[in-house]
Amino acid sequence: MSKSENLYSAARELIPGGVNSPVRAFTGVGGTPLFIEKADGAYLYDVDGKAYIDYVGSWGPMVLGHNHPAIRNAVIEAAERGLSFGAPTEMEVKMAQLVTELVPTMDMVRMVNSGTEATMSAIRLARGFTGRDKIIKFEGCYHGHADCLLVKAGSGALTLGQPNSPGVPADFAKYTLTCTYNDLASVRAAFEQYPQEIACIIVEPVAGNMNCVPPLPEFLPGLRALCDEFGALLIIDEVMTGFRVALAGAQDYYGVVPDLTCLGKIIGGGMPVGAFGGRRDVMDALAPTGPVYQAGTLSGNPIAMAAGFACLNEVAQPGVHETLDELTTRLAEGLLEAAEEAGIPLVVNHVGGMFGIFFTDAESVTCYQDVMACDVERFKRFFHMMLDEGVYLAPSAFEAGFMSVAHSMEDINNTIDAARRVFAKL
């Protein structure tokens, strides 16, 4: 047995499923998950000594690549001063200044410890600010594991949501309406059914948890218009897209102004950080200045703030996003060319430093139904064959891939060459 197999066997006796987040268990592709010993730049190194070009990037945070010296040094320096104080620090102020400068729609920001904390807190704030209870989310979008968000659509377009996880009471789910991504008609129908009851829409501006599905041109502006028409808040969940699709996020890339923004992943530089913020009048409703409660023992802790501050300063440097886009575009085009040579139908969506690979005969993939129609079994075989070639993709047909500026054009070309060999056998 390999070291990964031995560790996985031991882990399953001690940790549910052997992992601390379900997708890591390789249940979406089968087989034994890799146990990682170290990472550097664009590469992961497993406990068996094998190296992989990494397109998971810790599920998004590693936009600069692994073990970036600026972030590593910032963490070391901060740790020498203490790990956590439970009191305000100068770095929290500097971090808030930087975030609000980089994302102009955020007048104020509150730091938390994860993307889930950011989205659940933003929704609570929206409910408290509007005095309404219902929310709209979209089928196939993921906003963390808060109870109100683990909800799937009911049997009809206007039915109330149903829990999609045991442990979520139906009474919680009934306040969540699930609409179709990229379908404004379904959103208008929900508003017309409940015109005075919907507090907010929460949306991934690029859906990254049904692989990678960008918005149609009219979708995000249409959501903004519907929120204005019916008096609801628009929450853009940029946990995945923030600082990756563009410096000011997908909201800037697509030209839409939210009321609240949720951030995570890149904002922590690899440390556990989330944030939410937006309009000053809305944020003023948050405790201690307002009645909507939110708190956290480790929120804004000095180690995480130092890592995030260092990361964002690097991400804000000229040329970073142009490089991400160039590398991702080359990868997408190369994969399509290689698939076409082998006669394999493929769609590759990409925007900024995100991409998604879909085995499908369809000309495009724009919604959850399109994603579910793709050939998942073929993706599973593709994943393992690419892994054998030394390329680490997300171990699920429903997760996006992530580029970093640490990837070289040689890494990209080697990945395309590997895919060409795999497609010939697939």
Swiss-Prot record:
The keyword Magnesium does not apply. It comes from Escherichia coli (strain K12). PROSITE patterns: AA_TRANSFER_CLASS_3. Homodimer. Belongs to the class-III pyridoxal-phosphate-dependent aminotransferase family. HemL subfamily. PANTHER family: GLUTAMATE-1-SEMIALDEHYDE 2,1-AMINOMUTASE, GLUTAMATE-1-SEMIALDEHYDE 2,1-AMINOMUTASE 1, CHLOROPLASTIC-RELATED. Pathway: Porphyrin-containing compound metabolism; protoporphyrin-IX biosynthesis; 5-aminolevulinate from L-glutamyl-tRNA(Glu): step 2/2. Aminomutase that catalyzes the transfer of the amine group on carbon 2 of glutamate 1-semialdehyde to the adjacent carbon 1 to form 5-aminolevulinate. This is Glutamate-1-semialdehyde 2,1-aminomutase.
